[in-house]
Regions:
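Conserved beta-propeller blade signature
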Residues: 53-55, 110-111, 165-167, 222-223, ...
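Short loop/turn segments immediately following the C-termini of beta-strands
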Residues: 59, 115, 171, 227, ...
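Residue-level detector of Asp-centered blade-edge/turn motifs that repeat once per structural unit
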Residues: 48-51, 104-107, 160-163, 216-219, ...
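A short loop-to-beta-strand structural motif that recurs across blades of beta-propeller domains
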Residues: 62-66, 118-121, 174-178, 184, ...
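Gly/Pro-rich loop segments of beta-rich domains
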Residues: 9-42, 72-98, 128-154, 184-210, ...
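Extracellular glycan-recognition/adhesion modules and their associated mucin-like linkers
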Residues: 354-381, 398-431, 447-484, 501-507
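Blade-level signature of beta-propeller repeat domains, shared across WD40, Kelch, NHL, RCC1
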Residues: 322-353, 504-505
Length: 507
């Protein structure tokens, strides 16, 4: 069960930092158990899928692991033995060799920069692994031909755009290459020389110096962590390259001003949030910086000291130790691979101020009746009705709140029953008042009748943590009009306001 606090922080506080995985001891341990008690060994790349599951490369364990929304950790790829093998079979039985960054496509396939195998591997949603780029021999060759016959040289970063095109940075080739959906490979940035040059001209003629992460925005613009150039480079849709952050002088400085006038020190990780802000992890500055859409830069986490500290408080004075990969979820929670601390950290989203943290397990009490929301007869079947019931310390009355996205600036949740794993929905996706509430397996991001907005209403009759629960599809509120045990329905805002108010109680 999640140990997430019921409410992240209040509206007057700064988003806090916390640890989501790892004890700080380097090793391999904990699969099937709580991620917070697991051992990691140099976590590197990270990505979060649409359901809130977090995947990361456990670099020195030669594995890819995942953390589900209930806080449990497991291995999805790699045996722990460095090597190459297993293509065509289950990813958990395959060998990886110092895996780096990760990316996800729209079909849920996971791409792995399998660095010392000089390959990019793909893990499909059914858990099978294959090679999509690289012949396994370090070098540079193959442009214009099949990506699987090409030579790569320590692929580091991977990104997938909206069309399914895959981008790969190569550390020793000082290039960014792309693999189109027909499997062909080509170079999009870098001429192979480890240097700096070419801004304002074609990216393929420019020079990069040990590139790390790459990300791509919705318009097809690439951002590259140009590591030893201590810069962030941008490749526009027309193929022209420019610098968007960093002077090229290694160091720390420039917060509050233009990112192009700031000093960076070995930028390695990148991620874009939903507003287009770019987050940068700096390996040697032990910091996370943020470049806003107006080109200004600032620090969001880390003091510059290589250490561990600050959990539970604001991220800015917290300590990181050689941070690497970055990721954001659907509500812009920021995840950090805190490499030398052997931990996965997260910074709560500003959008969650005054709202429950994603992953929190709670019970819901009707303000009117004080009865608890629960699945009728503890059923685990699809379509089972949700009632208000006498309070009982059992899982059919416990609900996991998982962020499901944003709509018109509001955070949406799926409300998942702990016993059944099914989510709260309006039966039949009805929009009429009086429609009953039931549980059903989650149907994905387009299932608006299974997504909910929590509307804080403040303390009520001495009770804190009180919300109205509004369905995204219908816009109506969960409501009970009696103190008897009965089915919960959706309705409008008329009548006794207590009948549509629910108190969140931490479990």
């Amino acid at each position: 069960m999640s140990t997430a606090p019921a409410v992240t922080y209040d509206e007057n506080s700064v988003p806090p930092i916390s640890t989501v995985a790892g004890t700080g001891i380097a090793g391999f341990k904990g699969d099937g158990e709580a991620a917070a008690t697991a051992q990691l060994n140099r976590p590197y790349g990270i990505v979060v899928d649409s359901t809130g599951t977090l995947y990361f490369s456990d670099f020195q364990n030669h594995r890819i692991r995942k953390i589900t929304t209930d806080g449990k950790i497991s291995t999805v790829a790699g045996t722990g033995v460095a090597g190459f093998g297993g293509d065509g079979g289950p990813a958990v039985s395959a060998q990886l060799n110092w895996p780096r960054e990760l990316a996800l496509d729209s079909e849920g396939a996971l791409y792995v920069a399998d660095g010392n195998n000089h390959r990019v591997r793909k893990i499909t949603a059914d858990g099978k692994i294959s090679t999509v780029a690289g012949a396994g021999v370090a070098g540079f060759s193959g442009d214009g031909g099949p990506a699987t016959a090409a030579r790569l040289n320590v692929p580091m970063g991977v990104a997938v755009d909206s069309t399914g095109t895959l981008y790969v940075t190569e550390y020793h080739n000082n290039r960014v290459r792309k693999i189109t959906t027909d499997g062909k490979i080509s170079t999009v940035a870098g001429n192979g020389a480890a240097a700096f040059g070419g801004d304002g001209g074609p990216a393929v003629s420019a020079q990069l110096n040990r590139p790390h992460a790459v990300v791509v925005d919705g318009a097809g613009v690439l951002y590259i962590a140009d590591g030893e150039n201590h810069r962030i480079r941008k490749v526009a849709a027309d193929g022209k390259i420019s610098t968007v952050a960093g002077t090229g002088v290694a160091g720390f400085g420039g917060d509050g001003g233009p990112a192009t006038s700031a000093q960076l020190h070995l930028p390695v990780g990148l991620v874009l949030d939903s507003a287009g802000n770019l987050y940068i992890s700096e390996f040697r500055n032990h910091r996370i910086r943020k470049m806003t859409t107006d080109g200004k830069i600032g620090s969001v986490a880390g003091t510059g000291a290589a250490a561990f500290g600050g959990d539970g408080g604001p991220a800015a004075p917290a300590q990181l130790n050689h941070p690497f990969g970055l990721a954001v979820d659907c509500v812009d929670t920021l995840y950090i691979a805190d490499y030398n601390n052997n931990r996965m950290r997260k910074i709560a989203s500003a959008r969650l101020a005054g709202l429950p943290e994603s992953g929190a397990v709670v019970s819901w009490a009707s303000v009117r009746s004080r009865l608890r929301m629960g699945v009728w007869r503890e059923s685990t079947r699809d379509g089972a009705e949700v009632h208000q019931l006498l309070a009982a310390p059992r899982d059919h009355q416990r609900w996991r709140l998982v962020a499901a996205g944003q709509h018109n600036g509001d955070v949406l949740y799926r409300i998942e029953n702990v016993r059944s794993g099914k989510v709260l929905e309006i039966a039949g996706a009805q929009q009429a008042s009086g429609a009953v509430v039931a549980q059903r397996a989650y149907e994905g991001a387009d299932a608006h009748h299974q997504q909910w907005r929590l509307i804080p209403v403040g303390p009520v009759a001495g009770a804190s943590g009180v919300y109205e629960i509004a369905n995204r599809h219908s816009g109506l509120l969960l409501r009970v009009d009696t103190n008897a045990r009965t089915v919960i329905m959706q309705d409008g805002a008329e009548g006794d306001h207590r009948s549509r108010q629910w108190q969140l109680l931490p479990v």
